[in-house]
Amino acid sequence: MAGNPFPQSKAQLLQAYRTMRTIREFEERLHVDFARGDIPGFVHLYAGEEAAGTGIMMHLGDGDRIASTHRGHGHCIAKGVDVTAMMKEIYGRRGGSCEGKGGSMHIADLD
């Protein structure tokens, strides 16, 4: 890691791994539930891109804001958006990050 301008500690690398696993498990759940018809609207999965979002978000501060694409679940999770609120949002339920009105493609957390 001599040439790496962003050397990471073992704890930071472990946290990055945990974040990537959380994203993947979240996406796998959505994939199954969408295939069963349990989710209203459309779902654009982020699976396979976990490292990109995690690596970027771990270098942002709490005050930094992000804007994502229609495949933004991983960005949101890596930035620290509450996973339960995200799941409620995707299912169109109250208590979601946008009170269930944004769905998969319009997850937002302005806090």
What does each model-identified segment do?
Residues 28-32, 38-111:
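Cofactor-binding active-site loop characterized by glycine-rich and histidine/acidic residues
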Residues 1-40, 62:
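Cofactor-/ligand-binding subdomain signature composed of acidic, glycine-rich
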